[in-house]
Amino acid sequence: MEGCTKDGAAVQSSGASTAGSIFWWLKDRSLGRGICVDPARDNFRTMTSLYSSIHPADSVNLSTRTHGAVFNLEYSPDGSVLTLACEQTEVLLFDPLSSKHIKTLSEAHEDCVNNIRFLDNRMFATCSDDTTIALWDLRKLNSKACTLHGHTSWVKNIEYDKNTRLLVTSGFDGNVIIWDTNRCTEDGCPHKKFFHTRFLMRMRLTPDCSKMLISTSSGYLLILHELDLTKSLEVGSYPILRARRTASTSDMTSTSSETRPSSSPCHNSDSGPLFEKHMSRSSQREGTSPRNSLEVLTPEVPGERDRGNCITSLQLHPKGWATLLRCSSNTDDQEWTCVYEFQEGTPVRQVSPRCSLRLTHYIEEANVGRGYIKELCFSPDGRMIASPHGYGIRLLGFDSQCKELVDCLPKEAGTLQEIRSLYSHKDVVLTTKFSPTHCQIASGCLSGRVSLYQPKF
């Protein structure tokens, strides 16, 4: 009988283990994990473990001292080229593995170059304070492929929808403009104004291009759900979900435009319950958002609940799970890095939709280099964050083990864990970027130096 008891216990234990394994397998499958679904996941997990041994490896050999501050860094999708957007009209190209200089586009623009975006392994776009966007071909860098005119103020960032081959740009004129790169000529591309809002700072598309996020200097975050870039959004033509604070169920604005705070970025002259007014009946019955429905949020920022803040930097998790914000107080005496998880699902009441974002992690940043925007980024697998921190960068994780976000979501917002700090600059770091293919990080600073970081053993 004793042996039977032991055997029975062993069988029961084995059965529980098998059941547990099945549940873990189902969970991983629902999250898109597995060798067949995400073959690069294990490689990225191994790569992430190497970042604890990362050190400053080299500084790129700059052939010119006329480029000024480095505002943006961008790797080509295959990791073979590192591009620099510089203060003094220049774009610099390097081989990130050898640190060798490839080319300097000395007159890429007529003013500061703000952002670079690769469309594929050979084509990339740049934007500038000269109000233009330029397209370039790596095989022919002696001249621009074409120049795009349409903005009336500084152009600050570029996004690209690979499915439709539409280029999306935003600027301080408050406009988001769509460019059809399928019909580009030397004279430019057909374009249209897609959206307009006041106080626009940054615009991003989620990896699947189902949402557009727009940050503002007034502390609002705008989210366009069920995104359709083929339709221009005129004032009053899109459904508006009431503005609200991310961690609260209370509305931040009235349902009437006459009582909306003056700093609200939304433009709408109609009164009445906006969500009910513009949402289609079919969408109300099904509990789904209509195409291009606009949600206006006031993200919760630690320590800034009673003070306004400016959302200066905006990034998206590579798997679309979360958004990453860099916020500064209106008095410019505090800076925070915050992570907000996307909350999907049908709201309990359509007339009072659930907030799409929830604050999960945060950390206070060094308050140096006031007035300059610091561009932070996710690692390729989304396990880590590289954030400018004074004269260096910090590598941050959701926990000390660098687990994926979905595996360590707290019930209440917690602090990001510092994995490593790297200081190799002599001036304030403004931008940082992970290589998409190699265990390497690049950072650029206000005085124009670019540092590369790699593991050393």
UniProtKB/Swiss-Prot annotation:
Composition-biased stretches (Low complexity): 246-265
Bias kind Polar residues: ranges: 281-292
Cellular component annotations (GO), alphabetically ordered: Cul4-RING E3 ubiquitin ligase complex
Repeat positions for WD: 65-104, 108-146, 150-189, 195-234, 306-346, 368-406, 424-457
PROSITE patterns: WD_REPEATS_1 (PS00678), WD_REPEATS_2 (PS50082), WD_REPEATS_REGION (PS50294)
Biological processes annotated in GO: protein ubiquitination
Pfam families: WD40
InterPro entries named in the record: DCA10, WD40/YVTN_repeat-like_dom_sf, WD40_repeat_dom_sf, WD40_rpt
Keyword Cell membrane attached: no
Keywords: Repeat, Ubl conjugation pathway, WD repeat
Pathway of action: Protein modification; protein ubiquitination
Region (Disordered): 246-304
Function: May function as a substrate receptor for CUL4-DDB1 E3 ubiquitin-protein ligase complex.
Family classification: Belongs to the WD repeat DCAF10 family.
Protein name: DDB1- and CUL4-associated factor 10
Gene: dcaf10
